[in-house]
Amino acid sequence: MKRIHITLPRQVTVSVTAGLLCISALAGCRTSADEPGASASGSTATSETTSTQAPQADGAGGKNATSASADSKSAGGGSSQGAAGGDGATSAGSAGNVNQANADLQAPSTGNKRIGNYDVPKTNVAWVATDGKDSNDGTEAKPFATFQKALNTVKDGGTVVAKAGTYRPDPIDVTKKNITIQSAPGATVWIKGSEVVDKAKWKKQGSVWAATGNFHNFCTVCTVNQDPKQEGMAAYPEQAFINGKALRQVASKAEVKEGTFYVEDKTPTTLKDPKNNGKGFNVGKQDAITYYVGSDPTNATAEVSRNARAITVSAEGFNLKGINVAQYSPVQSWKLQNDPVFKDKAGAVAVFIAGSKSTVVDSTFTQVSSGGALGFSDSHGSRAANNRFVDNGGGAAGANRSDDVVYEGNYFSNNNTAKFRIHDCFAYCTIADIKVTHTNRTVFRGNVVDYSAAPREASKASERTTTFPAFWCDEGCIDAKTVNNFFTNVGTAIFYEVSSGGVIASNVVEGSNTGVSVGGTDKVKVYNNTVSRTYRPIYVYEDARYDGCNSREKNSEKCVFPEEWSTNHHLSWNTTGVEIYNNILSSRASNGPKDATNVPLAMPVYLDGAKNTNGKEIYSNQMFAGFDYNVYYRSNQSNEPIVMNWDLPSKDPQKDGPMDVKFSKATDISKDSNAGKAVKGIETHALDTFGSRAHNPYFAKEAESNSAYNQSNYNLKEGSKARGSGKPLPEDVAKAIDPTGKKVAPGKAVDRGALVNVKMDSAKK
């Protein structure tokens, strides 16, 4: 059965002055004829929440710290809550709780490295503290209360130093160049988008507690999906916490019970067209809102949503160091530009950086609902390193129209806790741990995406429709480098879609649904990846769209909705010139022989050609420039009879072709007359063997269970045939894997499988 590619119109809107990153939460816009939407292909997903410790609620502090009351005028007020519809209408709620095992709240870090001891300049510096006053002089001894006062005081190149504590600031605007906001030496600093509700405000009503106040009127119809009801409760950005633990939002007061909450707004924001938020909004009033909770808030610290945006940066050279961000509630899209309080800053990301050469390091982003946590837009040469993105309601991070951005050493886990739709959402599928669009030379290196605590096994065939991409490069990623990353129990580890060029190398994927997926992308090099116990290790397909056009007139070549970035960069959106070398595909998570014949089709390498709408055929013979030196390790021939298919066009020009040729042995491919001789190698140097996981002849140790996450050592064992037998690396691949050139050099025979990885020995603590 052939993959059906559904295309909807798309339009890109980017405006830094208006605070627009794109219409979707973090990156990538695909639209219908009336309104921008989200990215139209590929990802399918839901997320799971683990019940663990959240950021500590703090009831004390300064003016902009944790002392904000439920009636705080500066917070705005009102939250829109109406009846929800669609699947999962009561399944979502506040962003998830921070997984204590994944995020040490005292010293957030992705490794053992001590963070938070940053040098403090002697001049052009201002201090803030939770017990500070804006009437002070901003010295360490007499700190300010608010970040904005400190920022207004320093000049270009200045530094704001935050003392330890929990702050609840109004949205912070950075307009000066080369500004740094950092934690004080050794200090743990949180900025939170929630407010503490005074215990006296809670009134018992039967089995629930109610608090009425000037809470913010959040838009609950501001989704990427034009019909918000299809997103169910995920469309509702409000959050509530008891002692830092997130409560789950429900659609009515009658549904409130222990661990849940409901928000009542009598004048909510509504749609001019109930099924199309692109037609505009009837903006709700800023009046009394009532939160109903099912957990006793009177002997605890109760927090509810207050702010959507934490920080907006419009100047270059910004640095954020050791500042943890939690409990912000941006709506998912940028469509609402006249929020009663936030105006054009109600969406769609908590920390929005539109300044080049910026850095975000050593920070935790958690419990950000609906919209994304960190977004770069028109932010060239920027870097995010050693951060944690955990338990966020939607996608965690993203970049749009931002060249030379580097993500390195970050940790991602348990995002999309709001459970946005990720299957059958077509143009509105946007959820990923990180999504990048319209960029040149993005680097995603040495990051960890770990869903080992999730209560599902992504490697099961059935999870194909319930899991989403970890790293998604979509719609005009040019020459991205995705290297040395570790993925466990994820949906699709690496999704490279309608883009061009790039290197996907030395990544390790274990216990997942799909390892590497390449579609509608030319000249990408897939080298030296290790994929273990994964349902579909490598998937390469042709996208029916072409030449940067998302939608054409029926029976016509006329492009109705061109994607401007891709057309300007002359991207073909055809899967051609792909190179696949030196990968180890081991111990596929198999359901038996039926995987090769039943939908969804799966085998170590699955190829899916297609005919473009202009009639051009892109099948296996057109897809590849080279394909060789890969390693296939299967349980046995009867359980896993097919190693790869070679997809060919149908002999009937009126029909899309079936999967014509299946190979039981990798070395048979080059001998088959159907395989195009223009493709170099065609596995003449492949290693294709059988055996148990316990006796894997390649790895030092491969865990035996699909769900035995972080228990394998993917270093090659002594005497392994994969040692030193791989194809020599091109210079760009070698440099992407090891920029220093100390461990990996071009032009020399290399090991097969991952060469350098952040968790080569995943069992090592």
Predicted ranges, named:
Residues 3-16:
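Bacterial N-terminal signal peptides that target proteins for export
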Residues 17-22:
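Hydrophobic helical h-region of N-terminal Sec-dependent signal peptides
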Residues 25-28:
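C-terminal motif of bacterial Sec signal peptides marking the signal peptidase cleavage site
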Residues 30-32:
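Bacterial signal peptide processing site
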Residues 37-97, 101-103:
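Post-signal peptide N-terminal segment of mature Sec-exported envelope proteins
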Residues 93-355, 558, 574, 627, ...:
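Extracellular polysaccharide-degrading/modifying enzymes targeting complex plant/algal/animal polysaccharides
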Residues 171, 309, 330-353, 370-381, ...:
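Glycine- and acidic/polar-rich repeat regions and solenoidal domains
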